[in-house]
């Protein structure tokens, strides 16, 4: 479960390393989970990256440490909370996605992110 003020790892090569959730605009609830789009601000970034510290982006959550129940009854959880930064058109900011991502991201319509990921779980 991701809420406001939660720190997330960034799972792409956009240059950002850590981001903080500042809003959950598209979810009519307090918490965000896998495949939700959230508003984030960059807290740690590489100096030569595209994403700069202090900038505000939208991001999709691709991994959560809290387990999520799937319709078939199985559960999925990861070791960390991670997201992929998006540009204003909903496309990934980076050109690579690092680590596995959840199948729910592809089912939501983010097929570009799923094709860049090394593994879809």
Curated annotation (Swiss-Prot):
It comes from the Bacteria. Gene3D superfamilies: Ribosomal protein L14. Keywords: Ribonucleoprotein, Ribosomal protein, RNA-binding, rRNA-binding. One of its GO terms (biological process) is translation. GO terms for cellular component: cytosolic large ribosomal subunit. GO terms for molecular function: large ribosomal subunit rRNA binding; structural constituent of ribosome. InterPro entries: Ribosomal_uL14, Ribosomal_uL14_bac-type, Ribosomal_uL14_CS, Ribosomal_uL14_sf. Binds to 23S rRNA. Forms part of two intersubunit bridges in the 70S ribosome. Part of the 50S ribosomal subunit. Forms a cluster with proteins L3 and L19. In the 70S ribosome, L14 and L19 interact and together make contacts with the 16S rRNA in bridges B5 and B8. NCBIfam families: rplN_bact (TIGR01067). Belongs to the universal ribosomal protein uL14 family. This is Large ribosomal subunit protein uL14.
